[in-house]
Amino acid sequence: FKQKTAYEIMPSLVGSEMCIRDSHRLAHRFGWDDNIFNHFSCALPGGEEFLVKAHGLLMSEVTASNLIVVDQEGRITRGNGTVERSALHIHAAIHLGRPDAFCILHVHPPYTTWLSSMEDNQLKMTNQNTIRFFDRIAYDDVYEGLAVARDEGQRMCQAMADKRIMIHVNHGVTVAAPTVEEAFFDLYYLELVCKEYFLVVSSGGSPRVIPDEICRKTVPQLEEEYLESAQLTMDAWKRVLEREEPDFRN
């Protein structure tokens, strides 16, 4: 997928708040959250500050009004609360090092985390949806504890290189994209295909892997509808939130 510079398509601060708020609520609905941990962010112009959830809030409690703005040093420049340590170091490093990464989603969802915990932790191309991730995933095979230092965030950014998705061994996943809609769409399908791959492996049968040449042929077909599909998907789930969680507007 073509890389874009996030700041060329940077929405307003209010628009950023709305989008990142919605993604937190939806992550809770889909069971991607991990108590008060895990973190999503949106960069502000220049990449020196970003919107993030205040530490201690559940994803189901996030509203636009209780998001905080944090700078590269962890100082809160708007809002009330603190930033979780790994949220600061992971997101600050990637926002600064990847100008295309307007939105970053870092989570430990069940099936992607299962894959990250396997000796062979690489996603196999076993069905049509897995091809969405053909040659798009970086695999970080270093786990040395919590990401609570600046150099660990920088190491993660380097390991991610130019990929939008990175699976962290024994840990979880980070998704980075120029828009919230694209990041959410990627995460939705990544967790889905990891679940499907888990079912294939658990069945005891041998996975039938799609040949690389077929994957390369199919990728452009998926790219044609990628941006529209990402936008329509987010719009559809926003309608669900409006019907069933009206307090999310706060």
Q: At which residue positions do the language-model features occur?
A:
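Single conserved hydrophobic/aromatic residue that forms the stacking wall/gate
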Residues: 1-15, 20
